[in-house]
């Protein structure tokens, strides 16, 4: 379950950002998850709660935005938006795609008091 390691990394970033900005308690966190990141949303919520235990983010509300992946088509030389690994280019139908974005997880923003 790689969700736990992703959430531990996100919790580290949240702690660092809260400290830098003088936030004593984080109330909300927004994560962007790429469509190809291979994470289970319910597992992400569960692991996030564990990763944030005993931190400034304990008990915060987690918001998850799934963003489409971007790929480069080798056959028609165009960018394409895809939502799954076995995607085809919407422009030419080719399966020869190189993922350029959307297989990661990032902390988009946070709110606190």
From Swiss-Prot:
The keyword Zinc applies. Keywords: Metal-binding, Nickel, Zinc. PROSITE patterns: HYPA (PS01249). The keyword Translocase does not apply. GO terms for biological process: protein maturation; protein modification process. GO terms for molecular function: nickel cation binding; zinc ion binding. Transmembrane segments: none annotated. Ni(2+) binds at residues 2-3. InterPro entries: HybF, Hydgase_Ni_incorp_HypA/HybF_CS, HypA/HybF. Zn(2+) binds at residues 73, 76, 89, 92. Belongs to the HypA/HybF family. HybF subfamily. Involved in the maturation of [NiFe] hydrogenases. Required for nickel insertion into the metal center of the hydrogenase. This is Hydrogenase maturation factor HybF. The gene is hybF.
